[in-house]
């Protein structure tokens, strides 16, 4: 498997989530990946209140980050603050999605809908 360089981010995944793809089945993990574009202020506030401090920022490709980790929303069966591998880099579960699918993760982005 080849490494892909995406705006300075090295990943082992052959397909990466993009705004135009919208949804991918990650071939290296059991997750289906989608993206969402919502205000992160409450998510960041709650994370900091839990004692996990890092810089919130948006990567040049529009992926929302907490420190060096991709912000992810996941099913409640995946503990909050867990680390998960995504096609866009290592993610941290800071948010929840409402889908019943426990194998779906939503990646926080600044990709306008």
Tell where the protein language model's regions lie, with residue ranges:
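Gram-positive cell-envelope targeting signals
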Residues: 1-23
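Solvent-exposed, well-ordered loop and adjacent helix/strand elements within mature globular domains
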Residues: 20-113
């Amino acid at each position: 498997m080849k490494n892909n360089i995406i705006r300075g981010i090295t990943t082992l995944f052959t397909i990466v989530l993009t705004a135009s793809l919208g949804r991918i089945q990650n071939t290296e993990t059991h997750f289906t990946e989608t993206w969402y574009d919502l205000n992160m202020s409450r998510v960041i506030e709650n994370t900091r209140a839990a004692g996990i401090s890092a810089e919130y920022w948006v990567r040049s490709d529009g992926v929302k980050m907490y420190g060096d980790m991709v912000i992810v929303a996941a099913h409640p069966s995946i503990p909050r603050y867990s680390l998960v591998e995504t096609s866009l880099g290592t993610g941290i579960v800071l948010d929840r999605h409402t889908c019943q699918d426990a194998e779906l993760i939503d990646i926080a982005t600044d990709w306008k809908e």
